[in-house]
């Protein structure tokens, strides 16, 4: 069977997070070249160097970006579009503010929506133009089970992920005629550093980032006409 991912360029935001790093590893194992983006420049440099040592035949580049900075995001998109035709975009970067709406500020709102919604919107908009020219593309937006459920402690996060779900649905309708598939993957809590900040649940029952990444790579690879544009992933817990 031909590997449709061989040689394709994947842009991954939040590439140094627990889930983003797992997705990067699985995609490079499939033969993808990588463009790794993180707000932690030193960390993404180290990660990219490690992958280059393991996969010297693959092209790997890394970029630091603060998604709260609109100009920085726009400059990054221009850079990505000018250098290579990326056909896979994984919007994995996110923030998880734990604060009820009553005590949230406009600054809290802006920070949450700038990272969780505006950045995926701009990146999807910018990179989709190249995907249209090529006639193939995959965009994966990392949502959350909070897209469907409210929470008294994480209201802004829930709202931002619900907005991302709506954005994904609209992009799917807009881009499907160009053979660009848009997915919103909405997992429950994951065993990452971000997941550790949620002390309301049992961390041992959280999803493992490796298994979520495996799902994501599967839907990117699946090239038949059957499609699941929304995926809700949760752990089966047997008492």
Language-model region placement:
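Substrate-binding pocket helix/loop in short-chain dehydrogenase/reductase
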Residues: 100-101, 108-110
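Active-site helix of classical SDR
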Residues: 124, 160
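Conserved glycine-rich cofactor-binding loop
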Residues: 16-17
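Conserved glycine-rich Rossmann-like NAD(P)H-binding loop of the short-chain dehydrogenase/reductase
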Residues: 30-47
């Amino acid at each position: 069977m031909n590997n449709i991912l061989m040689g394709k360029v994947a842009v991954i935001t939040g590439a140094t997070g627990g889930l983003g790093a797992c997705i990067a590893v699985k995609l490079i194992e499939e033969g993808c070249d990588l463009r790794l983006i993180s707000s932690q420049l030193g960390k993404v440099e180290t990660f990219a160097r490690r992958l280059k040592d393991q996969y010297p035949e693959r092209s790997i580049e890394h970029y630091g970006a603060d998604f709260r900075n609109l100009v920085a995001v726009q400059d990054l998109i221009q850079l990505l579009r000018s250098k290579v035709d990326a056909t896979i975009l994984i919007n994995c970067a996110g923030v998880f503010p734990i604060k009820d709406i009553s005590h949230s500020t406009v600054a809290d709102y802006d920070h949450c929506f700038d990272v969780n919604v505006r950045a995926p919107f701009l990146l999807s908009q910018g990179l989709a133009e190249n995907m249209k020219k090529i006639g193939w593309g995959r965009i994966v937006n990392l949502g959350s089970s909070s897209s469907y459920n409210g929470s008294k402690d994480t209201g802004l996060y829930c709202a931002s992920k619900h907005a991302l779900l709506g954005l994904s649905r609209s992009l799917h309708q807009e881009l499907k005629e160009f053979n660009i598939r848009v997915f919103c993957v909405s997992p429950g809590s994951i065993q990452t550093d971000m997941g550790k900040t949620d002390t309301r649940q049992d961390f041992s029952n959280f999803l493992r980032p490796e298994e979520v990444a495996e799902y994501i790579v599967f839907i990117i690879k699946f090239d038949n006409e059957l499609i699941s544009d929304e995926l809700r992933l949760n752990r089966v817990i047997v008492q």
